[in-house]
C-alpha cells in the first residue's frame, strides 16, 4: 500500500507456483483492497489499466512477462517452505531487470551470491524492506537500470553452465582421455 500511494498506476503481476492456486491468490489480493484480475480474463474490453494486480493462471507465460517488468521480486524465497528454496533469478536477469529475493534461496545459492556481489539483486526479508527497495528502484530509474545491467552481466557470464558441466563430466568419464 505504501508503494502504491507513492507510485499510482503500478501493476503487480503475481505468478503462483501452481496456477491452480490463482483463484485463491486473486481472492487474497481482492480482500486486501486491490483491483485484481486473472491473466486469462484480460481482454480489450477489460484492460489492465483499470487493474492493480494480475494473477497468472496459465503455464508458460511468465518468462516473456519479465520483459515488461520494471522490477522482479523472485518468489518462493521469502519464507522457508520445505521443498521450494526460491525460484530461478536468472529468468529476470536475462531481461536486465533489477531483482529482489528473500533469504531462502537454497536452490540457487551460487547465483544468489553472484547477483548480490555484482549488485544486480537485493535481498529483502519482510514487507517493509520490499517496499523500501521497490520504492527506491521505482524512484531512481538510473539505479534500476544499473542493477538490471549488473544482473544481466551475471546471466551472460553463466549462460551455458549446463553444457560446460556436461562437457567437463564427459571428459572426466571418457576412457579415451584417460592418462596412464
What is each residue range found by the language model?
Residues 1-180:
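Nucleotide-activated sugar donor-binding and catalytic core shared by glycosyltransferases
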Amino acid at each position: 500500500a505504501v508503494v502504491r500511494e507513492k507510485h499510482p498506476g503500478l501493476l503487480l503481476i503475481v505468478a503462483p507456483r501452481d496456477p491452480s492456486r490463482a483463484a485463491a491468490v486473486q481472492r487474497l489480493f481482492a480482500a486486501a483492497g486491490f483491483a485484481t484480475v486473472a491473466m486469462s480474463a484480460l481482454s480489450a474490453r477489460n484492460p489492465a489499466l483499470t487493474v492493480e494486480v494480475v494473477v497468472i493462471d496459465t503455464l508458460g507465460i511468465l518468462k516473456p512477462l519479465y520483459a515488461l517488468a520494471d522490477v522482479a521480486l523472485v518468489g518462493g524465497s521469502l519464507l522457508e517452505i520445505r521443498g521450494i528454496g526460491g525460484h530461478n533469478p536468472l529468468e529476470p536477469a536475462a531481461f536486465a531487470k533489477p531483482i529482489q529475493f528473500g533469504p531462502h534461496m537454497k536452490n540457487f545459492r551460487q547465483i544468489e551470491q553472484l547477483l548480490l556481489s555484482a549488485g544486480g539483486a537485493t535481498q529483502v526479508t519482510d514487507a517493509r524492506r520490499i517496499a523500501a527497495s521497490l520504492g527506491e528502484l521505482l524512484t531512481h530509474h538510473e539505479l534500476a537500470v544499473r542493477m538490471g545491467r549488473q544482473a544481466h552481466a551475471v546471466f551472460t557470464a553463466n549462460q551455458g553452465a549446463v553444457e560446460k558441466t556436461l562437457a567437463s563430466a564427459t571428459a572426466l568419464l571418457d576412457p579415451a582421455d584417460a592418462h596412464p
